[in-house]
Amino acid sequence: MEWTLSPAGRFAATALLPPLLLLACGGAGQASRPAATPKPGQSEQAAMPLPPWASSMKVAIQSPADGAKITANQVPLQVSFSGFQPSCDLAGTANVQGTGHYHVEIDKSLVDMFCAPSATISMQNVKSGTHTLTVLPALNDHAEVEQNAKSVSIDYEPTQPLAEIAPASVGTPSIKIVSPKAGSTLNGAFDVWVQASNFNVTCDLEGKPDVAGYGHWHVNLDSTSGPMMGMMTMLRMSCGNVLHLSAKGMTPGRHTVIAFLADNQHAPLNPMIEDKVAVNVAR
């Protein structure tokens, strides 16, 4: 069987992004994934096959059950995986057999990447009614194994609905990398600290319709261009002022750490708002 690579959800719209898939192997109690619409960069990725071992990367949604009624404003998601060991430390670096992570979508829109068995999905700005949660195995470079996606349907009927977040007028947004400093040497774990101004960062809106003045930020290594709009080099995304990262999968030598503001759909703001610093990765 030939396995093809596609843009990682809306990961493809950013660094991406992920952005996000066509076919799910439905297991017991898990709904087949509805057909997705074409995503940015899909045509350029169609001819790029996944490595043969990617077919063994499997996920299963342990909870919520398919058809579950959700009355809270967050959905606890429990995922099991086989055929790979999730490692967020390797995200955005070269693919290695047996490692990766998983992406979560709500209604075919990427929320975030995860590496732990448990994740929490906010229902902020989500209308009541039926929605679909999808989990997809992903390689280090965020290529999704769409054939092994799993989905469940939920009925969101909140007992205390959240007030909808409305557009905000915040002035001209900016982002500045506070740490690491230019010329720093990275070895093992390191943090990227940023200062975002005139921009409201929130995880609760990830994967939801865009809201002016709101979003989050991504960190890429060396590039924000190329296949899937640079998604292959996205290390992580954040809605705070710090990201805990690792140089574990990076090649030794000089690299550029790039931080940029992204909207709820993971696309960079237009015009792009970014900051970058040159660093060295220890040999």
Label each residue range with its predicted role:
Residues 32-36:
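C-terminal substrate-binding/catalytic lobe of Rossmann-fold NAD(P)-dependent oxidoreductases
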Residues 38-39, 134:
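N-terminal leader/capping segments at the start of a protein or of a new domain
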Residues 40-72, 157-187:
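Short, compositionally biased P/S/T/A/G/V-rich stretches that sit at domain boundaries
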Residues 26-29:
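Bacterial signal peptide processing site
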Residues 2-15:
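Bacterial N-terminal signal peptides that target proteins for export
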Residues 22-24:
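C-terminal motif of bacterial Sec signal peptides marking the signal peptidase cleavage site
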